[in-house]
Amino acid sequence: MVYVYLNHDGILGRGEAAPSGRYNEFTNDILNILDGGIDLQETIGDPLEFSEHVFPQCGGIKALEVAFSMAILDWWCQKERISVYEYLGAEPLKAPKTSYTISIGDMDLIPEKVKEGSPFHILKVKLGMGIDQDKAIMNAIREETDQTIRVDANEGWDLTSGIEMCNWLAERNVEFVEQPFKSTNLADTATLRKESPLPLIADENSLNSADIPKIEGVFDGINIKLMKCGSLFEGLKMVKMARERDMQIMLGCMIESSVGITAAAHLSPLVDYADLDGNLLINNDPYRGVTVENGKLVLPRGNGFGVSLSSNESNLM
């Protein structure tokens, strides 16, 4: 994780970059760009104009672009004495419940993993390891809990297994299936959508707003991740485009600290589902912001993102 700070006129705006090698983005590349210097406008004004000035200097790294979009929005909203959710036109009380991801590396650890997720109403389970293994994982989880489950197939199925699994999962309190096939296999995804009793949510097929027209009628919904799409402005555009097409919307994340997760949470009242647990899956989160109460996201009140430093690390602000 790399933190970006915009410190001007006594106001500090924070942003976070959490790059993913899956999209050929790496921390060292971000640090090299930052070490080379970023040219800023002489006068800091409109957040969108600021971002459009900075983004071309980010080397095409979306995680760095979103970090700058966070920092300017946090700074500008503090300056204007409003929250970011107000800027986005979101109502904090409409923030959804978030799922909690349980990663299954060892079947014997399933009871422990399920217990970790017991404070949440919804679990997210990653499958796509073969029908027999996937069913064994689900059966083991169902022996421990009847919580609603969201399944991420991680591009791991083919059409035959996808049809079988979607029908099988529909009988086991599963809410939807995320990314059943490779992102290049839209034809089989369209076929599965006709056969599946469960909604299909795009992940790798919904990187940014340009992808949405391509998957209309193929998926039932999209997963927006700020680190993939490149800014809160782009995330908001994706929300609007999906709504125009009657598509469901999930807001997801990478492994991020409370800076990135809180930024996404300010957008969450505008979506249907949230999977914003990245800060809960790390042990050294140096910030505090959005919290979870009874499984529901609770946005911090105050100006900007409402994020504050919770550690004594001297190199952080």
Where do the model's predicted regions map?
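Short loop or secondary-structure boundary microenvironments that flank
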Residues: 19, 104, 127, 131, ...
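Catalytic alpha/beta core domains of metabolic enzymes, predominantly
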Residues: 184-277
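Flexible C-terminal active-site loop/helix
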Residues: 1-3, 9, 254-317
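Metal- or metallocofactor-binding catalytic centers and their adjacent structured scaffolds
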Residues: 6-7, 12-79
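Metal-dependent enolase-superfamily TIM-barrel catalytic cores that perform enediolate-based chemistry
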Residues: 86-196
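N-terminal amphipathic alpha-helix/helix-capping segment at the start of soluble metabolic enzymes
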Residues: 78, 82-96, 290-300
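Hydrophobic faces of well-ordered beta-strands that scaffold small-molecule active sites
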Residues: 13-15, 96-102, 121-125, 149-153, ...
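Conserved, mostly hydrophobic/aromatic
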Residues: 4, 10, 68, 81, ...
